[in-house]
Amino acid sequence: MARFGAVIHRVFLPLLLLLVVLGACHVTPAAAAAGARLSALAKALVVEASPRAGQVLHAGEDAITVTWSLNATAAAAAAGADAGYKAVKVTLCYAPASQVGRGWRKAHDDLSKDKACQFKIAQQPYDGAGKFEYTVARDVPTASYYVRAYALDASGARVAYGETAPSASFAVAGITGVTASIEVAAGVLSAFSVAALAVFLVLENKKKNK
């Protein structure tokens, strides 16, 4: 029995300690995301979007031209400061006015809890500056929006950001679910129903007269 206890002590105890150490050192992606805060990121990107403040765009139809570049006046623009930037991810974010009373759209400093920037516009390799056109997706709901871009490192973690002014937001008119084609189809069916009813009444009237 004593010998068995010694084996347990020599083999399993070190293994248990190793597992504990590995568990303590391991950081899950969720935990890493929870540690990312917007207030801790350098505002190192300049982001511009083509819509004017207050302009209304239509989901599934209108396009936005987005440009981004390294902020030349920021401390992050020092030589080589952006060496760790590997990609830029651009998102469409609910403006403050469209967050009021809607917890599912609420902005949060802890980016793992942020619900304002739900719509991914694009992601492209970091090259100091970029420009692209985005057609507003059909599933973007009616609301006011602004654009935010994140600089990502090699692991995909957000390390810097930039955004258009939330106060100069533009609007998107979402698709209500009743499209023009549906309205046309409904009109055709309605006309067909009236015509069919008229034919039926005429035939019934002829039968009675016989």
From Swiss-Prot:
Organism, as annotated: Oryza sativa subsp. japonica
Main location class: membrane
Gene designation per UniProt: NAR2.2
Membrane topology: Single-pass membrane protein
Family as reported in the entry's similarity comment: Belongs to the NAR2 family.
Highest taxon, organism lineage: Eukaryota
Lineage: Eukaryota, Viridiplantae, Streptophyta, Embryophyta, Tracheophyta
Compartments in which it is found: Cell membrane
GO MF terms, alphabetically ordered: nitrate transmembrane transporter activity
Name of the protein: Probable high-affinity nitrate transporter-activating protein 2.2
Parts of the chain that traverse the membrane: 182-202
